[in-house]
């Protein structure tokens, strides 16, 4: 007889009502992420304010890393870790203000069951829309 003990399965997180989760995929280059962070913060303020006007809260799925100084998801591994904490049926906002690599969030997006809204800035100096469409 086996003595193997199966691990407990953690319950899926559940989103509070009228709450959307926000993610932002970054670049592979930390210098690009650091340089574009202020523009990303501005975009996130606009998105959060628009949701608030309609009675919704927006929760950033991951915080700002004190070591890098930005809150971009900057690797596939990080993307998997961030998406593990997002309720799978929650509304999700993918907000992009700079160049980014979609593969950082692709695995999480593939398994996410809730609605997904993609938003980007349209500025000549920071190509969020180009990053989003690319």
Positions of PLM-derived features:
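Metallocofactor- and cofactor-centric catalytic cores in central/energy metabolism, strongly enriched
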Residues: 1-134
């Amino acid at each position: 007889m086996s003595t193997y003990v199966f691990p407990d399965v953690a319950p899926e997180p559940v989103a509070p009502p009228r709450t959307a989760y926000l993610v932002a995929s970054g670049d592979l280059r930390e210098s690009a992420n650091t340089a574009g962070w202020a523009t990303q913060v501005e975009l996130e303020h606009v998105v959060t304010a628009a949701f608030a006007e309609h009675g919704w809260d927006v929760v950033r799925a991951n915080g700002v890393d004190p070591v890098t100084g930005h809150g971009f998801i900057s690797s596939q591994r990080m993307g998997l870790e961030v998406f593990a904490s997002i309720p799978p049926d929650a509304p999700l906002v993918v907000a992009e203000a700079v160049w980014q690599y979609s593969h950082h969030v692709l695995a999480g997006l593939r398994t996410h069951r809730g609605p997904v809204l993609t938003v980007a800035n349209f500025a000549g100096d920071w190509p969020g829309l180009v990053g989003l469409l690319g």
